[in-house]
Regions:
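A Rossmann-like FAD-binding core segment of flavoenzymes
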Residues: 35-37, 79, 85-106, 113, ...
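FAD-site-proximal beta/loop scaffold in flavoenzymes
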Residues: 135-159, 231-232, 243-320, 415, ...
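Glycine-rich dinucleotide-binding loop and its adjacent helix/turn
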Residues: 120-182, 217, 277-279, 501-503, ...
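Mid-to-C-terminal Rossmann-like scaffold of FAD/NAD(P)H-dependent oxidoreductases
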Residues: 8-11, 18, 294-406, 438-442, ...
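Beta1-alpha1 glycine-rich phosphate/pyrophosphate-binding loop at the start
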Residues: 8-87, 127, 176-199, 338, ...
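Short hydrophobic core segments
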Residues: 16, 113-123, 166, 244-254, ...
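Rossmann-like dinucleotide-binding cores of NAD(P)H-dependent redox enzymes
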Residues: 69, 162-163, 170-228, 308-314, ...
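Rhodanese-like catalytic fold shared by cysteine-dependent sulfurtransferases
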Residues: 427-438, 442-479, 487-520, 524-574
């Protein structure tokens, strides 16, 4: 046995890039193979860091720079005996010779390393508009720890009073919050008409209202055409309108796969120029694997190839590649882009697909909107969860969900993400046995309510119409618009031309309705309108209720933030 061990060939694994995917692969390989030679090349000065925490170091929430560093070259060697070389850039791959060319950035030395297995984890690079030429002192991108330190040092030294953030995705919004908390007046410039692309425009309206309520200015539908230094400030030039002057500019326009190395090596590329891989994370070249933001993935719900730049999938892919390198057979079954975001005192989260994707894939889907309290409404401090869920009509399978609120958002989105992964239907959602106590939830959890609502629609117990249908409803007397809210609620606004009958008076006042006319019912959140429709339907009235109620309609059409205290639907509080 001893002699056999001596003649066994030691496997040499070279990993290009650390952070999530590369570092995860390296550690997993060591756990599976104590004898393997593992060499990690990282272009930056940090091999494994909390890139999702970078904005919070700039904002002072994370106090110490060291907290961002998950592993160092020294700790990697001490614990895993992994040779990590930072400030080393791999500039070429020869798949035939199984070698990589390495450039030591600090010394300029160029060397060649052989490999038995190669893992590519180059990540993604920030999108910089072509109109931005060269580096400008007060213009930043945020990808690495070095970028973070540069921004942090600038903020500490120059104490900027104004900032323009080009881009309204995750990084842009997190930076907007953190700079605002530092007293910086922030303006977000967004090319599209909404922030947070994974959200549908109606749900994004809550995000818009939240940002504006905290003093963040939004310039929607605006395109950056150039950046121009102007003394101690920078002018952001727009396609339309006057330039925006600010003390600093952050480009957060998204990312694109960093695949130059793979392309030059002749590897097959996929969607958006990403590295094409199979479900074992293998590229088109033998013994070369790829993981992280640079690779294409299968969208779990639709099965289509896409790009998902999130830490969770990158870590999982690193582990899967490591398993297969060490003789296993692990598979990556796709990602559903589950994400969560803190926006001051609000949380926004999503999982699965949105309406834009469902329509592009020509799925036969429907949607529901509900506003349940995050915990029992009688327990102090209850606030609403604004939930939108998409489901497949034929199977009643959950396709996607979006939630905003002050508490309990992350818990519900994780349950729904699990439900999507398990292929759960409405019947299964309503039967989920979830933890309950008044400070945390209601006996019928919001997740259960999603199942109830979908099932009611599928069984024909109620019909619904949506906020975007309201404008097209006839106002010629051929239909009845019925508002069943309380007097106090109606006094603050109502649908034009609507008849007001509180739901508790409806049975006694049915004579005021014409049974020959379709009735379109609204309340504040959708619960009382459902109850009203059940009354009317059983009395022979053709009826539909407004999904999400007047509250959702008003929030979307007026982009008002409505995250105040919530009480059981229809109960007034003095």
């Amino acid at each position: 046995m001893e002699s056999k061990r001596k003649v066994e060939k030691i496997m040499k694994v070279v990993i290009v890039g650390g952070v999530a995917g590369g570092a995860s692969a390296a550690a997993r390989i060591r756990r599976l193979d104590e004898t393997a030679e593992i060499l990690v090349f990282e272009r930056s000065g940090f091999v494994s860091y909390a890139n999702c925490g970078l904005p919070y170091y700039i904002g002072g929430v994370i106090q110490e720079q060291e907290e961002l560093t998950l592993q160092t070259p020294e700790s990697f060697w001490k614990r895993f005996r992994i040779d990590v070389r930072v400030r080393h850039e791999v500039t070429a791959i020869d798949p035939t010779a199984k070698t990589v060319t390495v450039h030591a950035l600090e010394t300029g030395k160029v060397s060649t390393e052989t490999y038995d297995k190669l893992v590519l984890s180059p990540g993604a690079k920030p999108i910089v508009p072509g109109v931005v030429q060269g580096e400008l002192e007060r213009v930043f991108t945020l990808r690495t720890v070095e970028d973070t330190l540069r921004i942090h040092d600038f903020v500490q030294k120059h104490k900027p009073k104004t900032a323009v953030l080009a881009g309204g995705g995750f990084i842009g919004l997190e930076m907007a919050e953190n700079l605002t908390e530092l007293g910086v007046q922030v303006t977000i410039v967004q090319r599209s008409r909404q922030l947070l692309a994974p959200f549908d425009p109606d749900m994004a309206s809550f995000v818009h209202g939240q940002m504006r309520s905290h003093g963040v200015a939004l310039r929607m539908g605006a395109t950056v055409t150039g950046l121009q230094p102007d003394g101690e400030s920078v002018l952001t030039l727009l396609e339309e309108g006057e330039p925006l002057r600010a003390d600093m500019v952050l480009l957060a326009l998204g990312v694109t796969p960093d695949t130059k190395l793979a392309k030059n090596a002749g590897l097959d590329l996929g969607v958006g120029g990403s590295i094409a891989v199979n479900d074992r994370m293998e590229t088109s070249a033998p013994d070369i694997y790829a993981v992280g933001d640079a690779v294409e993935v299968r969208q779990f719900v639709t099965g289509q190839k896409t790009l998902i730049s999130l830490a969770g999938p990158a870590n999982k892919q690193g582990r899967i590649a490591a398993d297969n390198i060490c003789g296993g057979d692990s598979r990556f079954h796709g990602a559903q882009a589950s994400s969560v975001l803190k926006l001051f005192d609000m949380t926004a989260a999503s999982t699965g697909i949105n309406e834009k994707t469902a329509q592009a894939e020509e799925l036969d889907y429907d949607k529901i909107v509900l506003f349940p309290p995050a915990h029992a409404s009688y327990y102090p401090g209850a606030t609403p969860l604004y939930i939108k869920a998409l489901y497949e009509k034929g199977t009643l399978r959950l396709l996607g969900a979006q939630i905003v609120g002050r508490e309990g958002v992350d818990k519900r989105i994780d349950v729904l993400a699990t439900a999507i992964r398990a292929g759960m239907t409405a019947a299964q959602l309503k039967e989920l046995d979830l933890a309950y106590a008044p400070p945390y939830a209601s006996a019928k959890d919001p997740v259960n309510f999603i199942g109830y609502l979908i099932e009611n629609l599928a069984q024909g117990k109620v019909r619904q119409f949506h906020w975007h249908d309201v404008a097209a409803l006839p106002r010629d007397g051929s239909v009845t618009l019925l508002d069943v809210r309380t007097n106090a609620e109606v006094s603050s606004g109502r649908l034009e031309g609507s008849l007001h009958i509180p739901v508790d008076e409806l049975r006694e006042r049915l004579g005021e309705l014409d049974p020959a006319k379709p009735v379109y019912v609204n309340c504040q959140s959708g619960l009382r309108s459902y109850l009203a429709c059940r009354i009317l339907t059983q009395r022979g009235f053709p009826c539909a209720h407004l999904s999400g109620g007047y509250g959702f309609y008003q929030a979307v059409t007026q982009e008002q933030q409505r995250l105040g205290s919530i009480y059981p639907c229809g109960i007034e509080k003095a």
